[in-house]
């Protein structure tokens, strides 16, 4: 508990120092950017007129839809690749092929083939999340200590038992790392997708603000994305601690 409180205190101190440095840089004119007070005032305005809340829900809906779908498919595919050599040989080249293509490069193709509604945005988020998570899951399976597997076989365990009792628990830390990376990829992708083709969302709001050189609104969107991403990452860290207490 003391270590956790110390860590929280250091987190808060780090944020305070960062915001203080930001304030000093803008107040002294060292950088031509809006200060924390200006950004806070704009955030309050956007909250009161409902724009910020609407943008948050629009971006969250897209992120969660694509992220959950991507992770839900990545975990079984990763286990399949790691457990069966034939599946690995069939699937792994395609995974590596698509990993080399930035999901953002797929956006124009997705818009042409899927239309301009929510489908292309969710698809590219799904792709980014899937590719990040599937590799981590696969790596977790093939990294399991062979001694544990051989010991289970000596004790008479069947493949299904070894998979459920040895492979899955040993792979959980790798899976959660992949999920966290996938979450970051999802947020990066949704912002880019909204910059190109959207009528709502935090990325769309930044693109509109750019047209009018509205820096405070751009900063509000950036800070909001950072806060939402940090909160979701902390939830995943809590799940990691709960699932890997052993």
Swiss-Prot record:
Q: What is this protein called?
A: Probable ABC transporter permease protein BMEII0107
Disulfide bond entries = none
Q: Which domain of life is it from?
A: Bacteria
Q: Could you tell me where this protein is found in the cell?
A: Cell inner membrane
Q: How does it sit in the membrane?
A: Multi-pass membrane protein
Kindly state a single biological-process term from the GO annotations of this entry.
Answer: transmembrane transport
Tell me which residues make up the ABC transmembrane type-1 domain: 56-236
Q: Which SUPFAM superfamilies match?
A: MetI-like
Residue ranges of the TM segments: 12-32, 63-83, 94-114, 122-142, 172-192, 211-231
User: Which family, according to the similarity comment?
Assistant: Belongs to the binding-protein-dependent transport system permease family.
- Role description: Probably part of an ABC transporter complex. Probably responsible for the translocation of the substrate across the membrane.
- One family from Pfam that matches here is BPD_transp_1
A Gene Ontology term for the protein's cellular component: plasma membrane
Quaternary state and interactors: The complex is composed of two ATP-binding proteins (BMEII0108), two transmembrane proteins (BMEII0107) and a solute-binding protein (BMEII0109).
Classification via InterPro entries: MetI-like (IPR000515), MetI-like_sf (IPR035906)
Gene3D superfamilies reported in the protein's UniProt record:
MetI-like (1.10.3720.10)
Q: Does the keyword Protein biosynthesis apply?
A: no
Query: Which controlled-vocabulary keywords does the entry list?
Result: Cell inner membrane, Cell membrane, Membrane, Transmembrane, Transmembrane helix, Transport
Q: Does the keyword Transport apply?
A: yes
